[in-house]
């Protein structure tokens, strides 16, 4: 159940990130939008890849990579908000999604490790 929720949330998050990046029109923002797009879409890609992991170790590794990418995504979101490249509603929505995914990833990693 939690895995399906994580898969669904990570896909919704990736869509939100792609739409956010496509909507940024401020010149000289491409270095930030490129980083945000890479980190933000990598979260879901790693979660999806974990579903077909070759081992428990591989499964945990993919989830931990997704966790790191979600943390990086939060950084880029905050930087884009603080530099006025995205509005408060966009920032709050995407950051909340990211935070919720991160919580599920932490719980999933702990469960997988038997903690």
Outline where the language-model segments fall.
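Short, C-terminally biased terminal segments at protein or domain edges
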Residues: 1-49, 53-115
């Amino acid at each position: 159940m939690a895995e399906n929720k994580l898969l669904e949330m990570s896909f919704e998050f990736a869509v939100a990130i792609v739409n956010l990046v496509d909507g940024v029109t401020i010149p000289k923002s491409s270095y930030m939008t490129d980083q945000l797009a890479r980190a933000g879409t990598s979260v879901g890609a790693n979660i999806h890849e974990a579903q077909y992991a070759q081992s428990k170790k591989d499964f945990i590794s993919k989830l931990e990579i997704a966790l790191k990418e979600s943390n990086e995504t939060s950084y880029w979101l905050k930087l884009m908000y603080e530099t006025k490249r995205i509005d408060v509603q966009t920032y709050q929505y995407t950051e909340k999604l990211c935070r919720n995914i991160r919580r599920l990833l932490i719980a999933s990693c702990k469960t997988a490790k038997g903690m």
